[in-house]
Structures are given as C-alpha cells and as structure tokens.
UniProtKB/Swiss-Prot annotation:
Domain of life: Bacteria
Name of the protein described by the UniProt record: Putative dipeptidase SACOL1801
CDD domains, A to Z: M20_PepV
Cofactor: binding details: Binds 2 Zn(2+) ions per subunit.
EC number: 3.4.13.-
Active-site residues annotated for this sequence: 86, 149
Residues at which Zn(2+) 1 binds: 115, 150, 440
Sample GO molecular function, one term: dipeptidase activity
Length: 469
C-alpha cells in the first residue's frame, strides 16, 4: 500500500529534491548577517523548504532565519522530525558539478543527496502524502529544519530556546533500522602557544601548512610551503619515496624559491577516521624527517607524538571502549601553521557512555603544556541513549521491517544527529545496509530506490505514530 502511494509522487519528489540540491548551502561566516546567520546559502535552502510547504498548503514558522518548522496534524503531543539543509563543502575531485544535480536512470548525484537533503525531502513527502490522504491526525507534527548541523548546531540551540520541545521524534540523518544511541561529541583546538628563536640557522623553514576544512571530516588534501636552504633535489626525491612507501598521491613544485609539497588523502566522516586517509598528518610525518626551524619542529613532533596513526585516542591516553557504543575516536580535521602565528590542530573527539571526558581532558591538557601546547575546548555534547525496547522505537522498527523483511536490531553510532536534542529522539534512516555511504565525500549520491523506499517507510512510521491510536 505505502509503496504504491509513493509511486504516484516520484516525479515530484525528484524535482523538489533537485531544487534543494542546487542550492550551495555551505556555511559561510564571511557573508553571515542578521538575515542569514550562517551565510546566504543555508538561508536560501531554509526558504526553499518554506516555499514548497506553502505551495502544498502547510503552515510554517521561522526562527531568526537560522531554523524553522513545517507544521501538520493536530493533537496534544508533537512528533518532531529533525532535518537539516546545510551541507559540508564539496571538496575536489567530483565527476560533475556537486551543486548541479545529475539524475541518471537509477540515482541522483550531488552534494547533500544523502546528508541530509534527500532524507529531508523523503520525510517531507511522507507528511504531504498523509495530508493528501486526509487522515485523521492524533498528533501534531513539527518538521524542524536546521541550517548549521554540520558545524556548531547554532540552529537547534536557537530553536529550542523558545520553541516547543517535541514529545518524541526522529532525525532522518543516519541509517535504518534505527539508531537509538549516539556517542558524546566535542571539538577542541590544540594551540601552539610557546614560540622560540632559533640559535642556529635551520636547513629548512616551514612557512605555512594547511590541511582540512571541517572538524568532522578527515582532510583529503594538505599543503606545506618550505623554505629550503640547500639540497632541494634531495628533499624532493625523499618526498617522492615517502609517497611511494605510504601508497599516497602527492606533488612537489617550486614557487619563487619556496618548495610546495602536497599530499592527497581520503576524506570520510569524522566519526570513523580509521577508514579515511588523513593527508595532513601524513605530510607532517614527512616534514619530521627535515631539520626544520624550532617552532615547526615542535609542531611536527607534537603531531607524531600524539596524533599520527592514532584514530582511537591511543597516543592521547584516551583509548576507551564499551560494548554498547564502541570506541573513543579522534579525528584531526583541521591543521594550520604559519611561521608568525605558530600552529593549531582542530580535533573532533567522540566518546561512549562511561568515558570520563573532563578527567581525561584535564590530564591531557596538563601533559601537553611541556611541549608548548594548550587545549581550547569548544562545544561538548554528552552521549545520548534511548532504550531500543521503548514502544516508540519499536513502532519505527516495525515500519521498517514490514517493508524490508530485514530483522536487524537497532544499534548505536559514533555520529551525531539532531535526535540528541530530544529526550526521546532517535535517528531513523535514510540509509539502508546496501547503500554506499559517500556522506562528506566526492560524488555523493542517493539511488532512486533508496529515496522512494525511505519515503514509504517514513509514511508507514508516521501513520502508526500520529494517525493510529
């Protein structure tokens, strides 16, 4: 029944999704304003959702142009469906323009198809189809739309300051059958705060180093600019050998007497950096072989001592595991250095329940002082957990099982979704076990089958939660 309903809307679903995907809704603080708190792209994507909602007869409510909601249903209780329309930067290496959606026979290719514009449109159409069926709603629905999920969650922070907290809810921003727990997440900077003068003339001086754009992405590109006093050819040959030994792609060029070294890695979501290749950490590993100036040497040595080849916090003394949520993970998402302001490592750390986060951070902060570094802590989100046997969770899982015959149990993840904003919130789709996960990677795509099947599952789930008694 549900799949047949969705079939009637397939062309509309694709057209509305294409319109949303064409908006480059990457956070841009340089263009932020009161009317566009995280830049014009995210604001435009939020407005787009309002426009299709108004077209279809829904009421909307805007919250300072950074978040808002589409309203449906009636009743005392509220089901929240928490989506986001911002995306991470596209990065390089795409086979097509990431903001000009390509629709093939069986897929749609663009930044945001999986994370989270495709699932957002799927959830929206589930609500729209039920509304078109004139169902007898027993709950209200607030489809809450954020514009800063990929960065600081300013959107939901602002939204929940003044707006009604849903009784229960889900975020269509992960996998099926259901994610009932999420690790704690924090970002922090390790800042080089002690600079020293060189007593002797160094053979090499690190002028600048840059790798990574986002804390929650493994950097796939790194560039170092090095002033080489002698043996330029030897350094280039050593670098080429290093790339070969580590199965890496990279390049070396000379620009006005400065040696420019680049390394290409593999970008993946920061919740599991072990499956990516951190270009920045590898390039620092090579630089450690050079007799650099003191400050650069301290920066490079710090990376090798605490960060390189340590995806689970081992070198930071933070290795920890639980059977329910798994391991601590540490992603070094941003690395910068220049010879005037020294260096910075931007870390995204995720931790399971039971990990003594504050104690671990205090110990680490004290330890790294001796190497001229300090911790600057950002936002901390504690772990989030809902019992998988809760009737709400079971209704979602039943809808999934009815349509897939897949009896996989709900599980927990290292990723963070809007679900953690709610006391009773879980992540629910829209990826299936056979979906290729290219979130935060080049050539991100969603299959039409996945898009329509997710819509159908959301349709049944929302019906069981908000229409049936």
């Amino acid at each position: 029944m549900w799949k047949e309903k969705v079939q009637q809307y397939e062309d509309q679903i694709i057209n509305d999704l294409k319109g949303l995907l064409a908006i480059e809704s990457v956070r841009d603080d340089a263009k932020a304003s009161e009317d566009a708190p995280v830049g014009p792209g995210p604001r435009k994507a939020l407005d787009y959702m309002y426009e299709i909602a108004h077209r279809d007869g829904f009421t909307t409510h805007d919250v300072d142009h950074i978040a808002g909601r589409i309203e449906a249903g009636k009743g005392n209780d509220v089901l929240g469906i928490l989506c986001h329309v911002d995306v991470v930067p596209a990065g390089d290496g795409w086979d097509s323009n990431p903001f000009e959606p390509v629709v093939t026979e069986d897929a749609i290719i663009a930044r945001g198809t999986l994370d989270d514009k495709g699932p957002t449109i799927a959830a929206y159409y589930a609500i729209k189809i039920l509304e078109d069926m004139n169902v007898d709603w027993k709950k209200r629905i607030h489809m809450i739309i954020g514009t800063d999920e990929e960065s600081d969650w300013k959107c939901t922070d602002r939204y929940f300051k003044t707006e009604e907290m849903p009784t229960l809810g889900f975020a269509p921003d992960a996998e099926f059958p259901c994610i009932h727990g999420e690790k704690g997440i924090t970002t922090f900077d390790l800042v080089q705060n002690k600079l020293t003068e060189d007593q002797d003339e160094p053979d090499y001086e690190l002028i600048t180093f840059k790798s990574g754009e986002r804390y929650n992405m493994v950097p796939d590109h790194a560039e170092a600019r090095v002033l080489v006093k002698e043996n330029m050819t030897d350094v280039i040959q050593d670098f080429e050998y290093f790339l070969e030994q580590n199965h890496l792609q990279g390049d070396s060029t000379v620009d006005s007497g400065i040696l420019v070294l680049t390394v290409e890695g593999k970008a993946v979501h920061g919740m599991d950096p072990s499956i990516g290749v951190n270009a920045g950490l590898y390039l620092l590993k090579f630089l450690a072989s050079l007799n650099l100036d003191n400050n650069a040497q301290a920066f490079v040595a710090f990376s090798n001592r605490y960060l390189f080849n340590s995806d689970f916090g081992e070198k930071m003394g933070m290795k920890f595991h639980t059977d329910v949520m798994g391991d601590v993970t540490t992603n070094i998402g941003v690395i910068t250095y220049d010879n005037e302001n020294a260096g910075l490592f931007g870390i995204n750390l995720r931790y399971p329940e039971g990990f003594e986060f504050e104690k671990a951070m205090d110990r680490f902060a004290n330890e790294i002082q001796q190497y001229g570094f300090e911790v600057k802590l950002g936002k901390v989100q504690p772990p989030h957990y809902v019992d998988k046997n809760d009737p709400f969770v079971q209704k979602l899982v039943t809808a999934y099982r009815n349509q897939t015959n897949d009896m996989t149990e709900p599980y927990t993840i290292g990723g963070g979704t809007y679900a953690r904003n709610l006391d009773k919130g879980v992540a629910f789709g829209a990826m299936f076990s056979d979906s290729e996960d290219l979130m935060h990677q080049k050539n991100e795509y969603i299959t039409k089958k996945q898009l329509f099947n997710a819509t159908s599952i959301y349709l049944e789930a929302i019906y069981s939660l908000c229409v049936e008694e």
